[in-house]
């Protein structure tokens, strides 16, 4: 089909391919000559028909590629992190929905919540911890509704969620401390109650939600973590994180980590050929980040999906990071054209 398709745009090629597939699968009533004429192919209908229906023709190739993409795996995990609710990108739920039919698990690698209300960063107006809790609960309910095939949702601890522990530890009323849960994400597993203006509001725990109150977890042979370190050298964190866990004596093949709001990945051949993924973030940029410090670099946005079978080492070829465009570009606000 090469000669008579030469010069066609991608859109034109996709249209022809769709019509030919529909013809073979009986999904349209078009004759082969109709497809030839409508797309100005300048060939006899039998040339197109034979090219598409031949044992190694277009339809066979289409089926091969389709079935290859649909290879079955025991585990298909979507890894997201640094969502920083309520400052998440507007498309986070849509991204989860996009993969909801294929994934078996959703893993949140730290900083689901921002906990801005108990932050040490200066702010003229804060939204309040109660509002953050309710917002996050509603978000997780929506995720649970999207993942309606009983997919497990796993969360680990991030540095922002650790702010709750610091806040409680600084409280002067020691008698009140035992009544407060320093693990704020655990409240979405167990449920929680808010008392306001003499009224009681109860929020039930989210089904199929697991929280690991630690900065890393070993899921099969994948380490998921949220370290506190940064590095200005691209890819350096891949080595730093891998080296740390090898020194801890853990058995693993792959690492996925958040926190940096940057992205890099690769085989760490210096450390037993482990594969490490510095997973991008899914939050909007914060004002306090780009504030004049010259070491600042823009965030990278995205998420990662890993596919593997039980009792098998993760194959790096089945690891894919999806990169996203910047959702909010404030640079345009700082441009002035002089008359």
What residue ranges belong to the model's regions?
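Short, amphipathic alpha-helical "recognition" segments used to contact nucleic acids or chromatin
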Residues: 6-30
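Charged, low-complexity C-terminal accessory regions
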Residues: 18, 38, 44, 172-271
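Short, basic interhelical loop/turn and adjoining N-cap
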Residues: 33-53
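Short, solvent-exposed alpha-helical "recognition" segments
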Residues: 49-65
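Beta-strand-turn-beta hairpins that frame and shape the catalytic cleft
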Residues: 68-78, 216-223, 271-274
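Active-site neighborhood of phospho(di)ester-bond hydrolases with catalytic His/Asp-centered motifs
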Residues: 79-81, 106-111, 152-159, 224-227, ...
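Core catalytic region of metal-dependent phosphoesterases/phosphodiesterases
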Residues: 80, 85-191
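Conserved beta-sheet core of the metallophosphoesterase superfamily
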Residues: 228-320, 332-334
């Amino acid at each position: 089909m090469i000669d008579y398709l030469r010069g066609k745009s991608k859109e034109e090629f996709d249209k022809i391919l769709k019509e030919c597939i529909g013809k073979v699968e009986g999904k349209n009533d078009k004759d082969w000559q109709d497809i030839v004429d409508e797309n100005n192919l300048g060939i006899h209908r039998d040339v197109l028909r034979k090219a598409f229906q031949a044992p190694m023709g277009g339809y066979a190739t289409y089926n091969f590629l389709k079935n290859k993409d649909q290879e079955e795996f025991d585990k298909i995990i979507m890894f997201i992190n640094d969502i920083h609710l309520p400052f998440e990108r507007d498309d986070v739920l849509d991204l989860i929905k996009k993969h909801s039919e294929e994934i078996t698990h959703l893993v949140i690698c730290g900083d689901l919540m921002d906990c801005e209300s108990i932050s040490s960063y200066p702010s003229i107006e804060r939204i309040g911890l109660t509002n953050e809790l309710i917002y996050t609960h509603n978000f997780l309910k929506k995720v649970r509704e999207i993942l309606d095939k009983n997919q497990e949702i796993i969360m680990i601890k991030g540095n922002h969620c650790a702010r709750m522990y610091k806040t409680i530890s600084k409280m002067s009323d020691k008698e009140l401390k035992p009544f407060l849960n320093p693990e704020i994400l655990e409240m979405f597993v167990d449920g929680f109650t808010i008392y306001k203006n003499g009224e009681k509001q109860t929020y039930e725990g989210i089904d199929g939600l697991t929280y690991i109150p630690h900065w890393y977890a070993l899921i099969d042979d994948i380490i998921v973590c949220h370290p506190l370190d940064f590095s200005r050298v691209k890819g350096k964190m891949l080595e730093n994180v891998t080296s740390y866990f090898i020194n801890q004596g853990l058995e693993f093949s792959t690492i996925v980590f958040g926190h940096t709001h940057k992205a890099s990945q690769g085989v760490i051949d210096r450390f037993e050929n482990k594969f490490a993924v510095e997973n991008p973030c899914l939050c909007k940029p914060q004002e306090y980040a780009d504030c004049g410090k010259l070491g600042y670099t823009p965030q990278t946005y995205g998420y990662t999906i890993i596919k593997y079978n039980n009792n098998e080492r993760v194959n790096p070829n089945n690891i894919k990071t999806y990169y996203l465009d910047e959702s909010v570009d404030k640079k345009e606000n700082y441009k002035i054209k002089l008359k």
